[in-house]
Amino acid sequence: MAGVEEVAASGSHLNGDLDPDDREEGAASTAEEAAKKKRRKKKKSKGPSAAGEQEPDKESGASVDEVARQLERSALEDKERDEDDEDGDGDGDGATGKKKKKKKKKRGPKVQTDPPSVPICDLYPNGVFPKGQECEYPPTQDGRTAAWRTTSEEKKALDQASEEIWNDFREAAEAHRQVRKYVMSWIKPGMTMIEICEKLEDCSRKLIKENGLNAGLAFPTGCSLNNCAAHYTPNAGDTTVLQYDDICKIDFGTHISGRIIDCAFTVTFNPKYDTLLKAVKDATNTGIKCAGIDVRLCDVGEAIQEVMESYEVEIDGKTYQVKPIRNLNGHSIGQYRIHAGKTVPIVKGGEATRMEEGEVYAIETFGSTGKGVVHDDMECSHYMKNFDVGHVPIRLPRTKHLLNVINENFGTLAFCRRWLDRLGESKYLMALKNLCDLGIVDPYPPLCDIKGSYTAQFEHTILLRPTCKEVVSRGDDY
């Protein structure tokens, strides 16, 4: 504004000395100059975007250089945007392209965390899970081999038709492998049994991506100690602490869509039990080796007993022959049914029933330094709804409510009192007893050999596929 006022003052001074014509010309030229200056001012105030339209006069030379630099910068930015768009699959603006580029980096295969927390289904986004150990079936009694099954197109087609089922077992098995590896990294004397079970189950729920009855834990975590062989898990308030001289059987299960992995191992800290563990592991592997399509269950039991009893162990200066626990068995597994009807004995003299194509079995063996027979003992913690029970009228409201809770959360899978506590249930013991008395729910109390004895267990789940036998729960550990 100051420049415009100066020009106007100068014009009035000149008008006093010139004749009228000259005064008109002078006034015109002064007005033109003032207008030019106004235009320049306006163009400068508009900034770089308007500067591109300025006339190339001397005073605007600096502005033109600025505009040129701006244009160069914007051209470089456009080029970078184009490159980013190509990396980001070619759609969206530059910023979107950069974001997509970052997402592309994240698409790489996920790796398991420590401690494990990434669900198995996220580690294998293509939905194909690792196979277990594939074995050829044993030769038949007349000496014929089963090698033809691996090349038969018919058997391959049958195997492929059930691929979705096998894949569910494999996902559950991979979760089991990773959980038990994690457990072995921290389990130690001094921990309470409740602490051990809850830590194990929390990890299992994450890896299996628990989802109601579609995926989750197949049965409570067994952590039976010493002479107790099976079906012990702590109830609320149990203060039992794991000791250095304890021999602990960790038996837990996972499932996807009711396809159950039943797998167990024994944990010890004192090396004096090593031979006992070796005997039972060898017996379990013998049972797995003998199992197959058309194999008689009694033959598997006889082979297991022969291997188990070939071992002697020395514990605290006393020698024992390892005995198979004759009233504990392996078993067939059905969908949402841990015991599907057939039993695999671990001593001779069992049923002559044959294993069949497409069946799933838990091959488990128990060795003992005691009598080799177990009986019910201690407080019950395991329960399971009877698979074959029909409609039973229930009068008590609390019993009806508890049955609804069991149906919604466990169905026909086994459960324990801790899991009812976790769901917020309280004062349910009378209702639970009522369900047991009515035959709707079966109790499974701890099974123990004589006091002072030691028991060990190893177990795997096998699939009798049309082409081969798959030890689906096999791992690097056992």
UniProtKB/Swiss-Prot annotation:
UniProt biased composition (Basic and acidic residues): 55-79
InterPro entries attached to this UniProt entry: Creatinase/aminopeptidase-like, Met_Aminopeptidase_Type2, Pept_M24, Pept_M24_MAP, Pept_M24A_MAP2, Pept_M24A_MAP2_BS, WH-like_DNA-bd_sf, WH_DNA-bd_sf
Chain positions recorded as a divalent metal cation 1 binding sites: 251, 262, 459
Lineage: Eukaryota, Metazoa, Chordata, Craniata, Vertebrata
The family this protein is said to belong to: Belongs to the peptidase M24A family. Methionine aminopeptidase eukaryotic type 2 subfamily.
Post-translational modification comment from the UniProt entry: Contains approximately 12 O-linked N-acetylglucosamine (GlcNAc) residues. O-glycosylation is required for EIF2S1 binding.
Record-listed E.C. numbers: 3.4.11.18
Modified residues (Phosphoserine): 45, 60, 63, 74
Pfam families linked: Peptidase_M24
Composition-biased stretches (Acidic residues): 80-92
Function comment: Cotranslationally removes the N-terminal methionine from nascent proteins. The N-terminal methionine is often cleaved when the second residue in the primary sequence is small and uncharged (Met-Ala-, Cys, Gly, Pro, Ser, Thr, or Val). The catalytic activity of human METAP2 toward Met-Val peptides is consistently two orders of magnitude higher than that of METAP1, suggesting that it is responsible for processing proteins containing N-terminal Met-Val and Met-Thr sequences in vivo. Protects eukaryotic initiation factor EIF2S1 from translation-inhibiting phosphorylation by inhibitory kinases such as EIF2AK2/PKR and EIF2AK1/HCR. Plays a critical role in the regulation of protein synthesis.
Gene that encodes it: METAP2
Record note on quaternary structure: Interacts strongly with the eIF-2 gamma-subunit EIF2S3. Binds EIF2S1 at low magnesium concentrations.
NCBIfam families membership: met_pdase_II
Note accompanying the cofactor annotation: Binds 2 divalent metal cations per subunit. Has a high-affinity and a low affinity metal-binding site. The true nature of the physiological cofactor is under debate. The enzyme is active with cobalt, zinc, manganese or divalent iron ions. Most likely, methionine aminopeptidases function as mononuclear Fe(2+)-metalloproteases under physiological conditions, and the catalytically relevant metal-binding site has been assigned to the histidine-containing high-affinity site. Also manganese has been proposed to be the physiological cofactor for human METAP2.
Cell cycle is among the record's keywords: no
Molecular function, one GO term: metal ion binding
Stretches for region Disordered: 1-122
Source organism per UniProt: Homo sapiens
Residues holding a divalent metal cation 2: 262, 331, 364, 459
Protein name: Methionine aminopeptidase 2
Cofactor(s) it depends on: Co(2+); Zn(2+); Mn(2+); Fe(2+)
Glycosylated residues in this chain: 60, 63
